[in-house]
Amino acid sequence: MEYGKAWEFQRDLFRARSQNEIIDTFLILQHPPTYTFGRRSQAGRCILSEEKIPLNPPLLKGESSLTPPFRKGGVGGFDRSLSGEDIEHADIYWVDRGGGATYHGPGQIVGYPIMGLKEYTADLHAYLRMLEEVMMGALKDFQIESQRLKGYTGVWVGGEKIGSIGVRVIRGVTMHGFSLNVNNDLAPFEKIVPCNIRGVRMTSMSRILRTEIIMPEVEEGVTDHFARVFDVKMERVSNPLQPCLV
């Protein structure tokens, strides 16, 4: 799903969940090539063509406008230089989540929980650890032993990052989520400083196991471990915006 459409869908779900019109929802998606920059993205060098200005989100009620560190044809946002060809083949979004820069693309699983956080934990840091546990459990299903790295958010294998997290909680409801590298091309990460961590090297399940991974199997594992970690029963629905009965 194109990132902008997924973002708009998230925000529709957020509004409905905030008003208790729907129950908690967990989206699992893949995106076409997309760079996103969170609220903690550091300034650096990037030349943006007039046609590829980073896109801003529609505002939620009570939000102030975002001021992205980009200016057309100038400097800002990226910590490394993106060529015109790079920009031409990827969308660019300045988003309202925490964290810095990241890349999404085919072969990467992205999970977006839209949930009332207090039902699971009152601690945002505990929530981040729970998302890490979901990814670590899914990796273990494929005999990949992963770890947390002290001082950083996300999931690591042998010092290389395989899972990233960037979230936002508004009035107790979560948005955004995590990404797990499965079969995706890792080269685009070299054009940015992922998650503001200089010198970080990204990896993927297929790179570690040296074989193509069956995506539905990983998606099933992520879903199962999400249910385990958050102690919920998962049910697939065709329209999560359909009001629930309370």
Where are these regions (language model features)?
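Beta-strand scaffold of nucleotide-dependent catalytic cores
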Residues: S164-G166
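Short, structured patches in soluble enzyme cores that scaffold and shape functional sites
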Residues: P113-G116, V169, L180-N184, S206-L209, ...
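Coil-to-beta-strand transition motifs
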Residues: E160-I162, R171-V173, N184-A187, V200
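C-terminal accessory segment of soluble enzyme catalytic cores
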Residues: L186-V246
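Conserved phosphate/anionic-ligand binding catalytic regions in large, soluble enzymes, centered on
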Residues: T102, I109, V173-L186
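N-terminal lobe of the biotin/lipoate ligase/transferase fold
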Residues: M1-K61, L66-W156, K161-I162, K191, ...
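A short beta-strand motif that forms part of the nucleic acid-binding face
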Residues: S41, V169, N196
